[in-house]
């Protein structure tokens, strides 16, 4: 009888330790520098206050490193990418990563220092687009919606320049690394830039874009975990902390309304 009581006490104590360890688990979350970092700071604060979760934010300046760090185990989560980009990374790199929650749609837009509308665009003008596969497709789809090009019907979210079957304005389309696109504005008719790098250069789609991606975009950004930690209570708490009005209000402040709630 004493042995059974002792075993029961040990089991209860073990469960207590497990619960305590889970609550004490510190999350390392990868984010991109700039406004997205500031938005995640609010989520981290809520995670601590509401769920007693300590969150360390690891800041990156590129789109390649956060997934490699997460897959390696140097991070517990990251929050910077949409699903088409994640799917492409998984296919190319073999990462064991999964989305665990939505954040916002940050619409891409065309920006220009040379023209105020497409009516001023000239035949043969040079334009700039992102060169990474997913955001290149996103930019090409946006160009097609403006009737500037036509893509193959089956190109979909993996469209590349070889899928352009009509270019009636004979536009020269330059593919540039995303962080460098704002620097091209002095040299091209317009550049298609995502919200992160536009915002870092004082640009917002609703105010400065000559045309903008709409609310029906499939490119909602994600909170991403590894397959082996996706069901962690700590991960779930961070997602709940992010998907709050406080975070939405901070994003609205940082992005000046240039985002759409994804949850």
Curated annotation (Swiss-Prot):
Lipidated positions (S-diacylglycerol cysteine) are: 20
Which keywords fit this entry according to its UniProt record? Cell outer membrane, Lipoprotein, Membrane, Palmitate, Signal
Protein topology in the membrane? Lipid-anchor
Q: Which GO terms describe its cellular component?
A: cell outer membrane
User: Lipidation, kind N-palmitoyl cysteine: residue numbers?
Assistant: 20
The signal peptide stretch is 1-19
Q: Which InterPro entries match?
A: Lipoprotein_NlpA (IPR004872)
Gene3D superfamilies to which the protein is assigned, alphabetical: Periplasmic binding protein-like II
Q: Where in the cell is it found?
A: Cell outer membrane
Family recorded in the similarity comment: Belongs to the NlpA lipoprotein family.
**Record's protein name:** Outer membrane lipoprotein 3
Q: What is the organism of origin for this protein?
A: Mannheimia haemolytica (Pasteurella haemolytica)
